[in-house]
Swiss-Prot record:
Residues 89-169 form the S4 RNA-binding domain. Belongs to the universal ribosomal protein uS4 family. Keywords: Chloroplast, Plastid, Ribonucleoprotein, Ribosomal protein, RNA-binding, rRNA-binding. The keyword Chloroplast applies. One of its GO terms (molecular function) is rRNA binding. GO terms for cellular component: chloroplast; small ribosomal subunit. It holds the Pfam family S4. It comes from Festuca pratensis (Meadow fescue). One of the primary rRNA binding proteins, it binds directly to 16S rRNA where it nucleates assembly of the body of the 30S subunit. With S5 and S12 plays an important role in translational accuracy. Part of the 30S ribosomal subunit. Contacts protein S5. The interaction surface between S4 and S5 is involved in control of translational fidelity. SUPFAM superfamilies: Alpha-L RNA-binding motif. It is found in: Plastid, Chloroplast. This is Small ribosomal subunit protein uS4c. The gene is rps4.
Length: 196
């Protein structure tokens, strides 16, 4: 299956708020779940919805998500915890969390158009896995800095997770450590995704 490029608000109404997909939030009165689906939820449906939340929030294809679940399953720690850490340490997600992009698809575009440097080298792969002590900057040209400047000025520094630090004057971000579970920006039960 390919990456989803359709109407984002339909997905938000069905699955709930997905901050990585769009800044908009669903209205409380327009909840499709309450209008059409009453009664008991089946376990399969609950697990599928959790998986779809994860997929649409991080902008993954089905194959990419399966690959991440497989890698997390090989780890000695909790599979769900490792899965979220792998997804949160992707370059496109870190740009979104730093406030350099308004959404994860916007961060993917910045990376694909070669505006981002990691440790002084151009990286054009959005799924690049960042490590602790990686320094993420924009290119030195005016166009790259201009794209990021307006977004960083409007972002809230209080929402910055503890595993990241940002220098707004130099348009530079630093990955301090691996993410803790409590700083994940999405309300999700990752164990249901692993079970699916």
């Amino acid at each position: 299956m390919s990456r989803y490029r359709g109407p984002r608000l339909k997905k938000i109404r069905r699955l709930g708020a997905l901050p990585g997909l769009t800044r908009k939030t669903p209205k409380s009165g327009s909840n499709l779940k309450n209008k059409f689906h009453s009664g008991k939820k089946e376990q399969y449906r609950i697990r599928l919805q959790e998986k779809q939340k994860l997929r649409f929030h991080y902008g993954l294809t089905e194959r990419q998500l399966l690959r991440y679940v497989h890698i997390a399953g090989k780890a000695k720690r909790s599979t769900g915890q490792v899965l979220l850490q792998l997804l949160e340490m992707r370059l496109d997600n870190i740009l979104f969390r730093l406030g350099m992009a308004s959404t994860i698809p916007g961060a993917r575009q910045l990376v694909n158009h070669r505006h981002i440097l990691v440790n002084g080298r151009i990286v054009n792969i959005p799924s690049f896995r960042c490590k602790p002590r990686d320094i993420i900057t924009t290119k030195d040209n005016q166009r790259s800095k201009g794209l990021v400047q307006t977004l960083m000025a409007s972002s809230d520094p209080g929402k910055l997770p503890k595993h990241l630090t940002i220098d707004t004057l130099e348009y530079k971000g630093l990955v301090n450590k691996i993410l803790d579970r409590k700083w994940v920006g999405l309300k999700i039960n990752e164990l249901l995704v692993v079970e699916y």
